[in-house]
Amino acid sequence: MSQNQEISKKEQYNLNKLQKRLRRNVGEAIADFNMIEEGDRIMVCLSGGKDSYTMLEILRNLQQSAPINFSLVAVNLDQKQPGFPEHVLPEYLEKLGVEYKIVEENTYGIVKEKIPEGKTTCSLCSRLRRGILYRTATELGTTKIALGHHRDDILQTLFLNMFYGGKMKGMPPKLMSDDGKHIVIRPLAYCREKDIQRFADAKAFPIIPCNLCGSQPNLQRQVIADMLRDWDKRYPGRIETMFSAMQNVVPSHLCDTNLFDFKGITHGSEVVNGGDLAFDREEIPLQPAGWQPEEDENQLDELRLNVVEVK
């Protein structure tokens, strides 16, 4: 066997392993939050970025082995930004044989008309885009709207709200839309961005640049993203543990009187969540809780339940 064949064989092995991990992550998120149900018609919002391409690919893959029946329709909003490659997504989706709809709305022109030069356009653009996608979901008769946000996006949102908003609020894997008419799901909620990036690179998706509108990146979010990436490099397992913390909230040991009845504590009240250790500090694990090095993931695979019959 030639050296090139050896490399190709290794690359394929790594891609299969990566795809299996992404499928498992998505399958677990779907099961944990009951994201997809029998007969669902899912509107997959496709921007042309790595996240939405990966979401569509994994959902299509799971569709073949899932114990329930559901359908997918990919939707892209062409906002008429200068230089937007209109042919890329239709060609890609037709090649896959995926049902799709390209919605053409000149939101770019509206934003440029309403927002003074030099001011950020993201807020108005987001509101316009959201309204159009909600309308499209109704027109297509879809039961769920799938967005491509991943675990890193969720953590970034948590820290943005903590640092700048004064609240512990992240990005929900599943919730009712703000208009009260649609269920929004995020199937990539358990997926790492670095896994998605590696998968997108290996699959060579036809990526569409995200800066066509000319807007500047969200500086606050970028600072948080850089901070999390730095932590991930310097302290392996910290990101995983922080995300686990979002799934293991202990209201009695926080300060929100809406979540826990502190005023109702009297002599004779039951001990809740271990009670207060008073002067003693809580014992903290030396290693991040629940984290395993990446090379140990084969062992973890044997212990986890493949909820969507990943093969």
From Swiss-Prot:
It comes from the Bacteria. Its cofactor is Mg(2+); [4Fe-4S] cluster. One of its GO terms (biological process) is tRNA thio-modification. Its EC number is 2.8.1.-. InterPro entries: Rossmann-like_a/b/a_fold (IPR014729), TilS/TtcA_N (IPR011063), tRNA_Cyd_32_2_STrfase (IPR012089), tRNA_thiolation_TtcA_Ctu1 (IPR035107). It catalyses: cytidine(32) in tRNA + S-sulfanyl-L-cysteinyl-[cysteine desulfurase] + AH2 + ATP = 2-thiocytidine(32) in tRNA + L-cysteinyl-[cysteine desulfurase] + A + AMP + diphosphate + H(+). GO terms for cellular component: cytoplasm. Catalyzes the ATP-dependent 2-thiolation of cytidine in position 32 of tRNA, to form 2-thiocytidine (s(2)C32). The sulfur atoms are provided by the cysteine/cysteine desulfurase (IscS) system. Belongs to the TtcA family. This is tRNA-cytidine(32) 2-sulfurtransferase. It comes from Shigella flexneri. The lineage of its organism: Bacteria, Pseudomonadati, Pseudomonadota, Gammaproteobacteria, Enterobacterales.
